[in-house]
Amino acid sequence: MPIKKPCLKLNLDSLNVVRSEIPQMLSANERLKNNFNILYNQIRQYPAYYFKVASNVPTYSDICQFFSVMYQGFQIVNHSGDVFIHACRENPQSKGDFVGDKFHISIAREQVPLAFQILSGLLFSEDSPIDKWKITDMNRVSQQSRVGIGAQFTLYVKSDQECSQYSALLLHKIRQFIMCLESNLLRSKIAPGEYPASDVRPEDWKYVSYRNELRSDRDGSERQEQMLREEPFYRLMIE
């Protein structure tokens, strides 16, 4: 007499979610590579972009005390269990996905409050292409921690087109924004911090560095550095 076996069905829904996300990220990067020359030429047709600086911005001391408050269209959140103070634009300008591209700004530990004072007008600007950023609460980190000696600012970049792509205009604005951050810090003679081993930067960037967090890790390596330098987004920022 045949034995009836229970009908077992493996639920692959959770696996399918993970698998479906990976090709999407890879295809987004491939599309950016394929469109590199077109975007490169389009970016160079735009004139210099001038960002309206936000006024009446909070000080570093202010945001270290806030728990949750809206300021200049950004929700600032400072939880006691987190070493970072988070800022997120209530109505994002870029409606696309985050595909891993981000910038760090590294400042000498003792000058982080002053650096924030110098950059806050741009970070809170209505013209800023960055909808989400965070800064280290220096009161909550050890002196030699990774985000204490550098990488105190993190700027997250979101795409603005379908299929997680960037428009030439957004790329141009981001390039110009990074240049403004760099020049403001340099003009104010802020001492740079130790930029992360996980990141890359060109020689003329003294404070800002780049990393794609979906295709790299925090430890860094020669292979990772080479890979990041070949990222189409990074190349469109520096070439």
Curated annotation (Swiss-Prot):
Report whether Lyase shows up as a keyword of the record. yes
Q: Which domain of life is it from?
A: Bacteria
Query: What does the entry list under GO cellular component?
Result: extracellular region
Q: Which Pfam families match?
A: VRP3
Q: Which named protein is this?
A: Phosphothreonine lyase OspF
What EC number(s) would the UniProt record show? 4.2.3.-
Which EC class is this protein assigned? lyase
Of which family is this protein a member? Belongs to the phosphothreonine lyase family.
Indicate whether Secreted appears among the record's keywords: yes
Where do the catalytic residues lie?
104 (proton donor), 134 (proton acceptor)
Q: Which InterPro entries match?
A: OspF/SpvC (IPR003519), OspF/SpvC_sf (IPR038498)
Q: Which organism is it from?
A: Shigella boydii serotype 4 (strain Sb227)
The record ties this protein, via NCBIfam families, to: PRK15245.1
Q: What keywords would UniProt list here?
A: Lyase, Plasmid, Secreted, Virulence
Q: Which GO terms describe its molecular function?
A: lyase activity
- Subcellular location field: Secreted
Q: What is this protein for, i.e. what is its function? A: Catalyzes the removal of the phosphate group from the phosphothreonine in the mitogen-activated protein kinases p38, phosphothreonine in the mitogen-activated protein kinases such as MAPK2/ERK2, MAPK3/ERK1, MAPK8 and MAPK14 in an irreversible reaction, thus preventing the downstream phosphorylation of histone H3. This epigenetic modification results in inhibition of the transcription of a specific subset of pro-inflammatory genes, and ultimately to a reduced immune response against the invading pathogen.
